[in-house]
Structures are given as structure tokens and as C-alpha cells.
Amino acid sequence: MKKIIVCLLVCLVANMYAERIEPIPFGDMESWTVRYIKESKLLGGKTKTLYALAPTDTIWKNGPYYYGKNGNPWATSNAYANVIGIEKAAGTMMPEKREDGGTCCRMNVELLGVRVMGMIDIEVLVPGTLFTGRNLEPITTAKDPYQNIDFGVPFTGRPTALMFDYKCIISPEQWVWYAKGMAKPKKQEGHDQAEAYIYLQHRWEDEEGNIHSIRVGTGYKRFAESQEEWVNGYRLPIHYGDITGESWYKDYMGFKEMQRAVNSKGKVVLIQEEGWDATLEPTHMVIMLTSGRYEAFVGKAGNVFWVDNVNLVYEN
């Protein structure tokens, strides 16, 4: 019996040293910038609070926030908009205290209402999202929300998994809201879910400024049911190369047609994913943690996704 116990302990210690866990900067959710935005009088003139996962700071003025400073890879769905001089703040991602101490990130799916001049009600559906890249403020139009997002950050590693703590509240109802703000919100068939994914991409830019990409690694998970107790140290495996032939592959794990990045000319352009290759060295990493799986303005208000302690796992 003693020999068996010793062997088990040896195996446990060997496994511990067979891998290493590297924190992603600010991924412990303990540092936040708080922004206070005073909305235009036309919208009621209230002061709204926006949060950024960033060095601890407080900003008491309207204006764009410049993501990507101080080695910070994170951006959020929280945004400051200035449309022909009308200023508005929208925030569905925020810090929240954990029951056993520390701080986590809470992401809500919300129908955000705007009352113009006290008469016209406008509602838009906004999921809370945390991602690697930049949100390019100010937002000047709602026609194409992706034109203000620079997806991904430079990265050359080859991790085996994305690791994080999570819990979620997911409605079982089989309908979602479509609410773009131009008309009354409509119900349509669907089931909204929280989502986590990581892409490792090899990118390059051609002479015309187009950004091309080969998918090197993929990790993807949708959370279809509520998990109201914390799951600590959840691991999302990263699979290298072409995953389309795997039994667990789903179409949504494939190439994203709407994601964009800023090219060397300072222009936001589509990221043209063109193939799979496990042998290439990654140049960029895209991590997305979001309370809703649908495109902009579609989802189930009331869903919530909490995350904490976001790390990368490597083999030694």
C-alpha cells in the first residue's frame, strides 16, 4: 500500500511540473479603470459609469479611452459614443466581488433604453464582452459595430489551453430579442448562450493593406445551461491545425467573417481567414469571453456570464 501511495505522489508531482501556467496581464480581474461619462442633455444628462479592465484609475471626463496601454491586452463592450455631438455611454461589463474574496468580471446581456427628449424610446440589445484587442472610441454610428473593433493582440506562444474560473445564468427559453434601436424590439427563434473562445492566427498584410490570416490554433466553448456555482480552473483545450474533420467540430468554430483589425495604414479592415496550418508560428491571439453568442443587437436579456483568473497553460 505504501508503494502505491508513493507512486501516486510521484505521478502527481510529475504532472505538476509537466506544465506551466502563465497569467494573462490583468486577467486576475483585480485592477479596473472607472470612467464617469455625462450624457448629453438631449438624452437626460445623467452620469453613467463605464469600467475597463486596466490599471487602477478614475477618469472624470467625457472622451475616448485608449485601449492597449501599459501592456494591457484587454478591451470590452463598454463604450463611449459621440454621434454628431450627442454623447452616450453604454456599459454591460463590470467588476463584482466574489463570495470568497477578490474581484471577478460580470458580463450581462441587457436591453439598454434611451429616451430622446423625454419622448422617443430606443432600445438596443447589448451583451457584455471581454476580448483581446481594442475598442476604437468614440463610437459614431450603430450601423456597423464591428468597424470600431481591432480584434486580437500580437502573440507568438503555443499554449495548450485557456484556463479560467466561471459561472453563468443562461435562460432555457428558445427565443431571443432582435433590438437594433431603429424599431421596437422583436422576438425571434433562438437560444442565447455564453461563449468563450481563443484563436491563434498567423497574419500578414499585402501591398493594398488587406490583412490575411491562417488559423493556427482554436479553442471554443458555448455554455448552454446555467452553472450557478463557480467552476474554478476550467480548461478550454487549444487544438492546432484543421479541426473541421473532428467529431466535435461545429460551424461556428470556423472562420469569422466580421472580425477586423487595424492595418499599417491605420485603417480598419476585415481579417481574411484563408486556411489552417498547425506548423506556422502565431502572430496574434484573439480571446473572446462574452455573455451572448449572437451577432450585435441579438440575444436574451437576463443572461449573465462571470469570469475570473484568466491564464494560459503551456507544456514544459
Outline where the language-model segments fall.
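Bacterial Sec-dependent N-terminal signal peptides
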Residues: 1-23
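Aromatic (Trp/Tyr/Phe) and Gly/Pro-enriched flexible surface segments
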Residues: 19-159, 163, 189-241, 250-316
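Extended, low-complexity, turn-rich repeat/linker tracts enriched in Gly/Pro/Ser/Thr and Asp/Glu
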Residues: 168-175, 186-191
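Substrate-binding/catalytic groove segments of enzymes
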Residues: 174, 243-250
